[in-house]
Amino acid sequence: MFSLQDLCRKHLFILPDVFGEHVLQQLGLYWKRHGSLQRIGDDHILIRRDLILSTNEALKMAGEEGNNEVVKLLLLWEGNLHYAIIGALQGDQYDLIHKYENQIEDYHHILPLIQDAKTFEKCHALERFCDVPCLLEHATKHNMLPILQKYQEELSIRVYLRETLFELACLWQRYDVLKWIEQTMHVYDLKIMFNIAISKRDLSMYSLGYVLLFDRGNIEATFLTQHLEKTAAKGLLHFVLETLKYGGNLNIVLSQAVKYNHRKLLDYFLRQLPRKNIEKLLLLAVQEKASKKTLNLLLSHLNYSVKHIKKLLRYVIEYESTLVIKLLLKKRVNLIDAVLEKNVRYFSAIKVRTIMDELSISPERVIKMAIQKMRTDIVIQTSYIWEDDLERLIRLKNMVYTIKYEHGKKMLIKVIHGIYKNLLYGEKEKVMFHLAKLYVAQNAATQFRDICKDCCKLDVARFKPRFKQLILDCLEMVTKKSCFSIIEILENYIISLFVMKVITEEEKNLCLELLYKVISYKTI
């Protein structure tokens, strides 16, 4: 509970001119040997109406003098008790400290406010259950090097404590402490310093670590390699450059930059590299499935001109990384056919399908390549893109006329007939007559014989006229290039039509005339 006088003193900001020294003393607004006290704003005071101090600075002075009355007044004015304790320590005013010790939860909280080592150690001593290691830990934390120097002999003996303080100095980034410990007592392993510097992105500590290593005179190549791998993997250009000052392999940096898509790191060094090295990095980028931006960066330094196309294609296929092909295609460097050819020749239908999807290759293009390489499995699997069987047949049928190789046409005819055989009965009716003419045109005797049997199996009354017309049409299509097997099939069916008397006299004469021509072809 505040007294009425305390409430008045707390909120009194303007002192009347009529207040003399006696009145001010009675109000508790007078500081012996200093003069009147007046509050200014939230955190300053006015002494003798001409000297302005911060409330906390005044608290430190009052504490040093052991003036509890002024301390209480300044605490009313929202000063920080910690500054009064610091002042009391500087003036050895322990009676004042004891009056407020119940209000101090932990003297460690005061340590960050202390500037000199002597007061720092005295403050720490107020914490009853703390020992020397605790003091040294806080001295390290708050960069109190003189305290560490005072206990140098003890640190020289206690290796574990020394190593612990060194690690803490790294975590708290206390460079003076780090340098002093290493130069006076040495640390068994400096790796912790580099690891923390990298994790905190602290280039100053990292550089200091190499200075200390250099002073030892034993910078190992494996050490440099590890650091280059770590820093390049994180894209830390300045750390990489600092490491390279002491040696190391630039290829490690470039490999990591490609692997982790650090373009700024790559761009810095690419300008210095010969073309062959950049091409090797491009292959690595394909292998690691690098990002679009990384690939574009490498390609731009090659002017989108790749000399070793075969090697690039091998990497694209082996690592299933097609993005580089798309990027080159945008620059009118078309490698799709080459990629497709190698995939169709050497790999499964599933892998070909993956490449087709990634590079947006049309099914027709894939099927033509598969026909050229005699990969029936790929033709069949690719045709399943068209889910409707009739559509599959129509598309494959249209492709027959675009195939230049006879062996390719025969293979495609076999695939088409296989699809036809698996159709439902009603669906077969829709395509059988068209396919029969295709088979005749392509000299596919086996398939023609098979489909003619299917035509005969249909309802005679309904389909015989249509079948008769099919035979007549096929007979007209027969040329001297036709195979004898198809001619024999047609002869047999024409004889059957004569016997069944379903052919007109005019059609009969036409058949005889066509057969005569065919027979003459056979005898030539």
Curated annotation (Swiss-Prot):
Q: What induces it?
A: Expressed in the late phase of the viral replicative cycle.
State the UniProt keywords alphabetically: Late protein
InterPro entries, A to Z? MGF_505
As for what it does, the entry says: Plays a role in virus cell tropism, and may be required for efficient virus replication in macrophages.
- Say which family it is in: Belongs to the asfivirus MGF 505 family.
- Write the protein's name: Protein MGF 505-2R
Source species of the chain: African swine fever virus (isolate Tick/Malawi/Lil 20-1/1983)
